[in-house]
Structures are given as structure tokens and as C-alpha cells.
Curated annotation (Swiss-Prot):
Record's subunit section: Homooctamer.
Keyword hit for Metal-binding: yes
Amino acids binding 5-aminolevulinate 2: 279, 318
Catalytic activity reported: 2 5-aminolevulinate = porphobilinogen + 2 H2O + H(+)
PANTHER family the record matches: DELTA-AMINOLEVULINIC ACID DEHYDRATASE (PTHR11458:SF0)
Protein purpose: Catalyzes an early step in the biosynthesis of tetrapyrroles. Binds two molecules of 5-aminolevulinate per subunit, each at a distinct site, and catalyzes their condensation to form porphobilinogen.
Major enzyme class: lyase
Assigned EC number: 4.2.1.24
Taxonomic lineage of the native organism: Bacteria, Pseudomonadati, Chlorobiota, Chlorobiia, Chlorobiales
Any matching Pfam family: ALAD
Miscellaneous note of the record: Does not seem to have a metal requirement for activity.
Protein name: Delta-aminolevulinic acid dehydratase
Length: 328
């Protein structure tokens, strides 16, 4: 009798993998189009679209073209966008960030008028709005915290006035969530939510995004306010503080390299958890696919599903359109 004849295997996991139908029936996690948010870059001008050179397939849009893009996104079933603006001018005081006729404020009004059902989230940070490329105001090479928070309050309120459904502070200044919540409530915008970039790491995966937004730091790096990639418990502290201060949704950023942080956040806190599939992660897939080294569609869908499996309720991704088409 051969060795194989002697096997007495009661539990054979492969039974449940034998056919596609069986695999689908026992699948534990499912990605849907409702999970996706599309980051949208808006620039000055009219009737123009520019491809971001370091992010093939990702574009900057003038407001009129952004409106058309949002109509297409909503038709695909995508429920939300996150708006990022490229201002016509940058100032040291960041005042363009809260200009009622600024790039983001105009975009919010136009998109909300054209696609009122779409959830509009807006980035709240100063890096595109000052010449320094940092998320806060700068004095003598130092990124100021409390002074920055005052500007962020004005920025968030201006977005709410324009029609934003959620503001998304990505700046990582201490105390900004509580301050923004207070400012929104005091200006009769208690229905406007806050999606906090709660655990945002000082990552090397952000390079192409800064290219897209023309917002690379002009000196130093962001390690004095963004988190050390080596730290886990610090992330839990940041998340807890933001929840206590009034965050409705918390985010972990970047994505794939920080799935352990997503899982810990979801296990520890009873709030919706978002994840950002960031520009560097997107660009790496694009580059490898262009070389023919990987199947882009399969890697895209696997990456997004893994984020869902780790505990993400919401996934910000530049692949939202492509994924939505696959999921239809």
C-alpha cells in the first residue's frame, strides 16, 4: 500500500476551492463600488485636463471638466469624491485656502449643483496654498501648530458654506479636529462631517501626489507633524484623540504598507475606518504593469480587496473608476 493510501484526511480545505461557485459562496470579504472614494485634483482654467506625469491615468481637471468627471463617477456608482485644489496663487499666510471664490470653493459649488447626490469631501491642509509646501504656516523654518489650526478652521467653514458634505483635515496639526468641529458648529454647519486623517505617516509613498498638486516641501520633510512609520501605539493615540475631538470617520494613510494599522484601528474603535491607496502605491502598479511584469487589473482588485479585508470601510483610490467598471 502506498503512502497516499494511508492518508486519513477528514478536513480538506481544498473542497471549498474546487469550483468558482464554491469559492464565491464561502468568500469572507467582498469589495463593492460603495466602498470607493475618488480623489479629484482641480486646477484653474477652463476646458482642460492634464495627465499627471508620475501617475499615468490620473488627471488634473479644470472645474468645468471636473463636473463632467463627477457625473461619470456617479453614473458608475461611486458615492464620494475627495477634492484637492491647485490655487492660482500661493501666499505665506495661506489665505487663498479660505477664499470664498477660491479654487476648491468654486469646485464644490459647481459639482454640488450638477451632481447633488454625490458626497463631496474636501481636503483641509495648507500645503498647496503656501509657497513652502508644508501642511501648516511656517515661521523661521518651524511649522506652526496653533496658528495653522486657526486658518484650518476658516478653510473648513468656507468649504461647508460652499456645500461640502465632509471636510477631511489631512494636516496632522494637534487639536485641529476639535477646533474645526467647534468652528463648524458655531457657524450652523453641525451636519457637515469630519473625516480625519488620524494616522497619517511621514511616508515616502506620497511623491507623485505632490507632483500632481505642485505641493512638494521646499525645505526639510514632514516628520515633525506626520507620524513615524515605525510606530503603532502612537497611531492608536492619534485615532483616539481625533474621535474624542469629534471625528466621524478616521483614516489611515498610506494604505497597503499600513494594513496592520487599519486592522488595529478597526478592532479597537467603533467608528468607520477609511484608508488611502496613495499615489506611490498606484504609481508602482502602473510602472510594473507598463513593463508587463504584472497584470494591472488583477493587482488593482487584489490590492483593494486586501484593504477591505484588513477592516477598511472606505477606500480612497485613484483606481476608483477602473475598479467600479470591474465591479458593475
Amino acid at each position: 500500500m502506498s503512502q497516499l493510501d494511508l492518508l486519513n484526511i477528514v478536513h480538506r480545505p481544498r473542497r471549498l476551492r474546487r469550483t468558482a461557485a464554491l469559492r464565491n459562496l464561502v468568500q469572507e470579504n467582498t469589495l463593492t463600488v460603495n466602498d470607493l472614494v475618488f480623489p479629484l485634483f482641480v486646477m484653474p482654467g477652463t476646458n482642460a485636463v492634464e495627465e499627471v506625469s508620475s501617475m499615468p491615468g490620473s488627471f488634473r481637471f479644470t472645474i468645468d471638466r471636473a463636473v463632467e468627471e463627477c457625473k461619470e463617477l456617479y453614473d458608475l456608482g461611486i458615492q464620494g469624491i475627495d477634492l484637492f485644489g491647485i490655487p492660482e496663487q500661493k501666499t505665506e499666510d495661506g489665505s487663498e485656502a479660505y477664499n470664498d471664490n477660491g479654487i476648491l470653493q468654486q469646485a464644490i459649488r459647481a459639482i454640488k449643483k450638477a451632481v447633488p447626490e454625490l458626497c463631496i469631501m474636501t481636503d483641509v491642509a495648507l500645503d498647496p496654498f503656501t509657497p513652502f509646501g508644508h501642511d501648516g504656516l511656517v515661521k523661521d523654518g518651524i511649522i506652526l501648530n496653533d496658528e495653522t489650526v486657526e486658518v484650518l478652521q476658516k478653510m473648513a467653514v468656507s468649504h461647508a458654506e460652499a456645500g461640502a458634505d465632509f471636510v477631511s483635515p489631512s494636516d496632522m496639526m494637534d487639536g485641529r479636529i476639535g477646533a474645526i468641529r467647534e468652528a463648524l458648529d458655531e457657524t450652523d454647519h453641525s451636519d457637515v462631517g469630519i473625516l480625519s486623517y488620524a494616522a497619517k505617516y511621514a511616508s515616502s509613498f506620497y511623491g507623485p501626489f505632490r507632483d500632481a498638486l505642485h505641493s512638494a516641501p521646499q525645505f526639510g520633510d514632514k516628520s515633525t507633524y506626520q507620524m513615524n512609520p515605525a510606530n503603532t501605539e502612537e497611531a492608536m493615540k492619534e485615532v483616539e484623540l481625533d474621535i474624542v475631538e469629534g471625528a466621524d470617520i478616521v483614516m489611515v494613510k498610506p494604505g497597503l504598507a499600513y494594513l496592520d494599522i487599519v486592522w488595529r484601528t478597526k478592532e479597537r474603535f467603533d467608528v468607520p475606518v477609511a484608508i488611502y491607496h496613495v499615489s506611490g502605491e498606484y504609481a508602482m502598479v502602473k510602472a510594473a504593469a507598463a513593463k508587463g511584469w504584472i497584470d494591472e487589473d488583477r493587482v488593482m482588485m487584489e490590492s483593494l480587496l486586501c484593504m477591505k479585508r484588513a477592516g477598511a470601510d472606505i477606500i480612497f483610490t485613484y483606481y476608483a473608476k477602473e475598479a467600479a467598471k470591474k465591479l458593475r
